């Protein structure tokens, strides 16, 4: 579905964020990104979403190389952005319309979809936003803004959903709904998170990024979360509790990734 080949990226006058990184996400996969703060997880999601172009290397969508310029020139930006969507860690970046209703309607209307009202009703109901439809987004709580931003993306019915720390502002009930909704869908998912419980329940495949922007591990999530399977420098060595009450331990040793 989406592939990065030998991708490198750095911000101006900054050290390399990602270096010669290659990965391939297949249709239907549920992939978790783990790594320390500053290792490039958010940057990687923005590259996959086409918001950034790599300094070196290339991005491929369904076998075809794409860049921001090529999508603009060929008029494919809107189509790609409907198919591959990104939920930012801070949802304020996505919310700019007068009301919650307008936010949910914006994407489908821009794409000329015929069932806009049905999409508004569905996701407002699913995310407990119906009573807030006429409110300005800036009056919502942080958790409500996160739910609204998620609803705006799901209203597009995307093929690939990229989530950057989605549980940061969400209440436990909404996190549970998110798990139940996404795990039973055939939608492709890539999620960057520090929430090990969410990672364990949503992910099938785990990619661990090192501080030098390289892939240290790419394999089954259960292997990554068992025993000596998480990178110590990622700051994830602690007990974590799953939604169903099971407590697990994550102990990490750097040499286990060599």
List the predicted regions and their residue ranges.
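Helix-to-loop junction immediately C-terminal to a conserved catalytic motif
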Residues: 49
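Conserved ABC transporter NBD signature motif
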Residues: 57-69, 80
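Conserved ABC ATPase "signature" region
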Residues: 115-132
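Conserved ABC ATPase signature
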Residues: 136-140, 144
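Catalytic Walker B motif of ABC-type/P-loop ATPase nucleotide-binding domains
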Residues: 161-164
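H-loop/switch region of ABC-family ATPase nucleotide-binding domains
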Residues: 193-194
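Conserved beta-strand-loop-alpha-helix hinge in the C-terminal portion
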Residues: 213-236
């Amino acid at each position: 579905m989406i592939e990065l080949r030998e991708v490198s990226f750095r911000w101006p006058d900054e050290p390399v964020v990602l270096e010669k990184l290659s990965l391939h996400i297949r249709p239907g996969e549920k992939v978790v990104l783990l790594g320390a703060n500053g290792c490039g997880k958010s940057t990687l999601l923005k590259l996959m979403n086409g918001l950034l172009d790599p300094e070196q290397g290339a991005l491929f969508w369904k076998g075809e190389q794409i860049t921001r310029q090529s999508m603009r020139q060929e008029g494919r930006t809107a189509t790609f952005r409907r198919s591959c969507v990104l939920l930012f860690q801070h949802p304020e970046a996505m919310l700019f319309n007068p009301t919650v209703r307008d936010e949910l309607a914006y994407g489908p209307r821009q794409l000329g979809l015929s069932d806009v009202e049905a999409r508004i009703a569905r996701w407002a109901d699913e995310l407990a936003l119906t009573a807030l439809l006429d409110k300005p987004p800036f009056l919502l709580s942080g958790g409500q803004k996160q739910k609204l931003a998620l609803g705006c993306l799901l209203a597009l019915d995307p093929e690939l959903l990229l989530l950057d720390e989605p549980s940061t502002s969400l209440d436990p009930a909404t996190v549970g709904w998110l798990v139940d909704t996404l795990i039973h869908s055939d939608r492709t998912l890539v999620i960057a998170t520090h929430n090990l419980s969410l990672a364990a329940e949503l992910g099938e495949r785990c990619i661990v990024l090192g501080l030098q922007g390289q892939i240290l591990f790419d394999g089954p999530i259960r292997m990554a979360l068992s025993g000596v399977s998480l990178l110590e420098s990622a700051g994830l060595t602690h007990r974590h509790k799953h939604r169903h009450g099971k407590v697990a331990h994550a102990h990490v040793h750097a040499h286990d990734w060599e």
